[in-house]
Design a protein with these regions (language model features):
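C-terminal segment of N-terminal export signals and the immediately downstream linker at the start
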Residues: 30-72
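Divalent metal-coordination and catalytic microenvironments
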Residues: 75, 89, 99, 128, ...
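Metallo-beta-lactamase
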Residues: 71, 94-95, 102-104, 154-210, 216, 225, ...
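N-terminal secretory signal peptides
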Residues: 1-14, 21, 29, 37-38
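C-terminal regulatory/interaction regions
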Residues: 3, 14-21, 308-355
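Active-site metal-binding motif and surrounding structural segment of the metallo-beta-lactamase
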Residues: 69, 92-93, 104-148
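Conserved beta-strand hairpin/beta-sheet module of binuclear metal-dependent hydrolase folds
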Residues: 68-113, 219-223, 227-232
């Protein structure tokens, strides 16, 4: 066999100095793509749909997004579209696929993978547990691929979850998606705790877990020879991120993850975002700086004794919304709910900012 797998039992990355979370920090929660929950009869609804109905709508909306193909290196291709971005290392040793789109996009994903050549998919790498990244695990495993992820991805996919989202209907109501435990065939067959290294197709690629950021299951994949980094939802390029506090996400962790990746990227690194266009070091730096600004503004309001409603009334993101809230399409002004991130549980602060 032409590839080898070297599992490195390196020490866990040091936790952030001081507090790793910030009570009252802002969760800039916008589910993607930009117009995901706009349009259709939902805009006239008085209440958000049921979690099951909302999930079906979400998958359908994601699946309506066209898929685009972009060559990143001789052996690396990015598919951008129905559920974010998929990165593929392809060569005589087989295909190594990072993330998998949403379930309804499987026929298109399969066609795109087949279009890269006849080599089989050897490994599927989940950057975290969310459905728009791991929905097609079972399909790919059925073709003979091994699904590889951080151990918390298996943990989270094995549990029921209610994932809070910002419903973008007429009333901007807070809603949630419900997930039952995933079937056994969709779960990763191989996991790691801290880091893992693969070598194939002339490439060395390192998988690295980070402290809780978007979730507690996040990893990034660094294709070292090609100078490509696939970040999953540790990076939303040009837009406010979605942070999942119910499974460990924190804005402080997102900042720390960006800092970690900036420390290994250079000015020529191609950075695949979980959502948004292909990025680079400058794009990631801008996103990191926006998160720092957002966190610090909310902390200042909290330290001044403002309640969540009072903080929202201050419109702390008025100058950020036109840049980060507009994303890639014209739409309503962004709305950002305030959350407490001092625990992994969602706090009861559902006030919305914006007009």
């Amino acid at each position: 066999m032409k590839f080898d797998f070297l599992q490195k039992q390196t020490s866990r990355r040091e936790m952030l100095q001081g507090s790793t979370t910030l009570a009252g920090s802002v969760l800039l929660a916008h589910l993607l793509p930009a117009t995901l929950l706009r349009g259709s009869a939902m805009d006239n609804a008085q209440r958000a749909p049921s979690p099951a109905a909302l999930l079906a709508i979400m998958r359908g909306k994601f699946n309506a997004v066209p898929m685009e193909t972009q060559k990143l290196a001789d052996t690396i291709t990015m598919f951008d579209g129905p559920g974010g971005a998929v990165t593929v290392l392809n060569g005589p040793d087989g295909k190594f696929v990072v993330d998998t789109f949403v379930a309804p996009a499987w026929p298109r994903l399969k066609e795109a993978l087949d279009g890269l050549g006849s080599a089989p998919v050897k490994y599927v790498i989940d950057t975290h547990w969310h459905f728009d990244h791991a929905d097609n695990n079972a399909h790919l495993h059925a073709t003979g691929a091994t699904v590889l992820a951080h151990e918390n991805t298996t943990k989270r996919m094995s549990e029921p979850h209610d994932l809070p989202v910002l419903y973008r209907g007429a009333d901007g109501a807070l809603a949630s998606l419900h997930f039952d435990p995933s079937p056994a065939e969709a779960l990763p067959q191989q996991t790691f705790a801290t880091s893992y290294e693969l070598r194939a197709n002339g490439e060395t690629f390192a998988l690295q877990h980070v402290a809780p950021a978007h979730t507690d299951s996040d990893i990034y994949v660094h294709f070292q020879n090609a100078n490509v980094i696939s970040m999953g939802d540790l990076f939303f390029n040009g837009m406010y991120p979605y942070i999942d506090p119910g499974t460990g996400g924190t804005i402080t962790g997102m900042i720390a993850a960006a800092d970690k990746i900036l420390s290994v990227a250079d000015n020529h690194t191609k950075i695949v975002a979980g959502h948004g266009p292909l990025g680079n070091r400058a794009d990631l730096t801008k996103s990191r700086d926006m998160l720092i600004t957002s966190r610090d503004r909310v902390q200042k309001l909290k330290s001044a004794g403002k309640s969540a409603l009072e903080a929202v009334a201050e419109k702390p993101f008025a100058d950020l919304d036109p840049v980060w809230g507009e994303r890639r399409r014209q739409r309503r002004p962004a709305r950002a709910p305030l959350w407490n991130l001092d625990t992994t549980n969602l706090r009861n602060s559902t006030a919305l900012a914006g007009t």
